[in-house]
């Protein structure tokens, strides 16, 4: 085997040879292509650099009562590139959503009938909601079997209606079936509408690790229907607020100030305020994906994962007794305190952040933060190693330089983390 250094040296030598020949032939009027063809190869390697880019475009729609007969959001999404076609659709619906909205299935059927010129529904499939569907090893094979049985092809649509876990599982199955079929998301939780549902990731859990297998594949469209939020229990409405606090802290100080000013209304789940939170949070996540320079996370930085290294571990340690938003709220508090103790964030800003989270109704302590390993170290610290492995490359954690401005760091001091845990316990 040729060593990596030797390989690149040969490639560089070949480039120099071609460059010299190009200059020589240019004086004689010879074409560059001729010089390329005439250049004798001095090695067995022949290197070609392939480069191309792909532009993605998908609408994110904010609406209400998307399956009302007069609402054209879904029809328009299906038809935006092929307006005169009848589109084959398989619809997968979160079982929890079907239980909360018993008339939803008939509404979908009536909607499809009213727009039969554009929609051909070939099935409505219930899918177990929550982390159950991401943990169950049968979920993806079962979905793939259904896609095959219903003759879904690369011009068909798979429509997922549900919380973030269902969107993740159905999205993953869709993106690996036939190397990717078109999928449309209907997020039904605050967490999915303002964060995960507007992104480009799909994943399920494996070997006890969160999102271990998955894909980066933008959806065809996202339709955020505020009517789904109305029927959520308070705990689920609150969970999505953690992601709004997170993205405000790392990207938009003005949005954080708005959250502070309206925390009482948000804690009461005022519909106008909750709608504003969802839109503001979703737009900031979309901006990061669009302008952050790394939508498919090829590098090591994950600014949108502020507070998540410990959150993912807490979800695992509590066997999902903490939902994602509750774990993220604790993670935000932990990393904000760390930002202060490490000298990056002004003193007192941690109190400000924790105060907002508590006014929104979050409990910022769980006894699993105190669970230690055989060396006496908090088990939650293992979340840093898991986080680095999931990201690849060097450890990169987002902390705060100011409210509204995140900063990347590449190491975390165990002693400071333990001090942060002590601080949270004292405030519990």
PLM regions and their residue ranges:
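Short, low-complexity intrinsically disordered segments enriched in A/P/G/S/L with frequent Arg
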Residues: 10, 14, 22-25, 35
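ATP/NTP phosphate-donor binding region
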Residues: 37-156
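C-terminal charged capping/lid subdomain of soluble metabolic enzymes
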Residues: 44-45, 53, 242-245, 344-428
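A glycine/threonine-rich phosphate-anchoring loop and its flanking beta-alpha core
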Residues: 52, 61, 68, 172-265
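A short, small-residue-rich loop immediately preceding and capping a beta-strand
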Residues: 150-173, 177-188
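Active-site segments that bind and position negatively charged phosphate/pyrophosphate groups
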Residues: 262-378
